[in-house]
Curated annotation (Swiss-Prot):
Substrate binds at residues 78, 117-119, 168-172, 258-261, 267. This is DNA-directed primase/polymerase protein. Belongs to the eukaryotic-type primase small subunit family. It comes from the Eukaryota. Residues 478-488, 498-512 have a biased composition (Acidic residues). PANTHER family: DNA-DIRECTED PRIMASE / POLYMERASE PROTEIN, DNA-DIRECTED PRIMASE_POLYMERASE PROTEIN. Residues 467-477 have a biased composition (Low complexity).
């Protein structure tokens, strides 16, 4: 081989190496699940929460949003993961190092479970019995659920998770309400705020700077009842590290798109992960395909609520100003309709407008009475009023309203009904396609920054390796232009194998002298 040919070969190899760097032959790592009942693989990482939410809401697969704190990153900096419950658990239980600081994103407007975040500083509260406080709180909340909603529950319906350390008592409580769930976590927050108002009032008296509301004094039996509850809820008052009094219950975990730490996860820089508490009485339903540990994990997820026609609980307080103070007055539904909620627009304004076109026609001005968003299944359920056309009976119902269900994943809508006979039949109309301008896939726009993170085969989360700016701006060479992702041609593979076998048979070696000469010429 001459020196010129050697230089040509070196140049060819360098060109191929550059081409492979900019267009790798291997695809990015995609996790795979082996069981037939498990969903197809979706594992996407985003640097921004809104990008993750947009992606999750715009694809058909059954996915959910989680946030991750990465070792070595700045405090408060999080990466957002979009995947299915099954896939997260599969890698969550095997790649503990990269997924050990994981949080569920409780989406704004999503139907959810009743939940609590409880904690106190042990050194400042040496006389307190945390287990007793948890038991008394569960009993009190169960009493209020029966009083307000007529729901019967007990400690057996409450998953109790513990991440306490020698310094801090820390528990999460997740209520599995029988055939019921809350409209979203803002309604959960209002319900908890109101039932704990006696404790807040008591705290306000001893600590004027403590958070709470001022209410007008109520005369008669109601005032006495409030006074009794203030005394009964005295166990909820704890002291922080500075000795200041505060509530045992964290009232700040009911904000929109709240990140709530997962079962078996710890905070960044900490080692105390949530485990099942010693006093936990909740036992998940058995399943042949799912282990007990995974069933606990699924039960712990706040928005893991499927649309089954269960009661959707709301809790609204109308603000009234009296002598400069706010007087929240409870407004709750007196009936047990399956579809309760706010009359404001849903998180999907375009879908709301489309549904209105379905019920405002033929001279009838229908309207959306209520809506509920089931994030677990990507379903928007609209309770319609004034428009009663039913596809089942092919006419307008005389007194019963209809339900419009929009499936954001499948990009279809269908009709259900409040009519007793239609409900007995469990009637559901045929599915009708959503207009393209309403479909989430049509609205999805991704940018390069959304591809900033990848997961390797060991579960490590790293920044994606991007090609240099020069390679992205240059025109593809004639040799590589038109390369695609299709499989290699079988005839090409056979020919390549024959050439390689011929080269092995010839067993020709380049003399050392010629190699040294080529190297010297290159230098």
């Amino acid at each position: 081989m001459t020196g010129g040919k050697w230089q040509d070969r070196v140049k060819s190899v360098e060109q191929r190496a550059s081409s492979f760097q900019s267009s790798p032959l291997s695809c990015p790592y995609k996790p795979r699940l082996s069981q037939p009942w498990q969903p197809s693989s979706i594992w996407r990482l985003f640097p921004r929460q809104n990008a993750a939410i947009a992606f999750a809401q715009h694809i058909k697969q059954d996915v959910h949003i989680f946030s991750l704190e990465k070792e070595g990153s700045d405090a408060g900096q999080r990466i957002f993961l979009v995947t299915s419950y099954s896939e997260l658990w599969h890698y969550y239980s095997t790649h503990r190092h990269s997924l050990m600081h994981c949080y569920e994103v409780i989406l704004e407007g999503a139907v959810c479970k009743l939940y609590f975040d409880l904690e106190f500083h042990k050194a400042s509260n040496k006389n307190l019995d945390g287990k007793m406080m948890v038991a008394k709180l569960i009993q009190y909340v169960c009493e209020k659920l029966e009083e307000v909603y007529g729901l019967h529950c007990s400690a057996k319906d409450v998953l109790d998770l513990d991440s306490s350390t020698s310094d801090k008592f820390s528990h999460h409580l997740i209520f599995m309400l029988p055939n019921a769930a809350f409209k979203d976590n803002s309604h959960v927050g209002r319900f908890i705020h109101d039932i704990l108002h006696p404790a807040l009032t008591n705290l306000k008296k001893s600590n004027p700077e403590a958070p709470g509301e001022n209410r007008d004094d109520v005369e008669g039996t109601q005032a006495k009842r409030r006074k009794t509850e203030e005394n009964d809820l005295g166990f909820l008052t704890v002291k922080n590290e500075k000795g200041q009094e505060q509530l045992f219950v964290d009232l700040g975990v009911y904000t929109k798109n709240r990140n709530f730490r997962l079962y078996k996860s710890s905070k960044l820089g900490k080692n105390a992960a949530f485990i099942v508490a010693e006093d936990n009485k909740f036992v998940p339903n058995p399943s042949k395909q799912i282990t007990k540990d995974e069933r606990i994990f699924l039960a712990s997820l706040i928005t893991n609520v499927s649309f089954t026609g269960q009661r959707i609980l709301t809790y609204d307080m109308t603000q009234k100003s009296t002598a400069g103070s706010e007087c929240p007055t409870l407004e709750r539904e007196s009936h047990s309709s399956d579809l309760l909620g706010d009359q404001k627009t849903s998180p999907f304004k375009e879908v709301d407008e489309f549904v209105l076109t379905l019920v405002c026609k033929d001279g009838i001005q229908g309207s959306i009475r209520r809506w509920n968003y089931f994030a677990c299944e990507q379903l928007l359920v609209y309770d319609i009023e004034k428009f009663r056309w039913c596809h089942n009976v092919k006419r307008f119902h005389k007194s019963n309203n209809i339900i419009i269900v929009v499936d954001l994943k499948e990009e279809v809508w269908y009709q259900k009904c409040h009519d007793p006979e239609c409900r007995r039949q469990n009637y559901r109309s045929s599915s009708f396609p959503l207009p393209q301008e309403v479909c989430m896939s049509h609205l999805l726009m991704e940018d390069e920054e959304d591809q900033a993170y990848l997961t390797d085969e060991l579960g490590n989360i790293e920044l994606a390796v991007t090609a240099p700016a020069e390679s992205t701006s240059t025109t593809p060479s004639e040799d590589t232009e038109g390369w695609g992702d299709w499989p290699d041609d079988p005839a090409y593979l056979r020919a390549l194998q024959e050439v390689e076998e011929e080269e092995e048979d010839e067993d020709e070696e380049v003399p050392d002298e010629l190699l040294l000469q080529a190297v010297n010429e290159c230098e």
